[in-house]
Amino acid sequence: MMSKLGVLLTICLLLFPLTAVQLDGDQPADLPELRAQDFAPERSPWFDPVRRCCSQDCRVCIPCCPN
């Protein structure tokens, strides 16, 4: 029975190697607001062109101005 499980495990690892799974460290930053749209902060109504940052609503506009 154990040898059958070993063969099954070996076949599974050959078909789906663990290196094919991306780990959390390999993932880009998860910013759903940025993924949902083609984001350009310069087009945001909160973007301050003089300071080159967003003055309000830092949840959707990045980079956020320090207060």
Swiss-Prot record:
It comes from the Eukaryota. Its main location: secreted. InterPro entries: 4Fe4S_Fe-S-bd (IPR017896), Conotoxin (IPR004214). The modification 4-hydroxyproline is found at residue 63. Expressed by the venom duct. Disulfide bonds join 53-65, 54-61, 58-64. One of its GO terms (cellular component) is extracellular region. This is Conotoxin TsMMSK-B021. One of its GO terms (molecular function) is ion channel inhibitor activity. Residues 1-20 form the signal peptide. Belongs to the conotoxin M superfamily. It is found in: Secreted. The keyword Signal applies. The keyword Signal applies. The cysteine framework is III (CC-C-C-CC). Classified in the M-2 branch, since 2 residues stand between the fourth and the fifth cysteine residues.
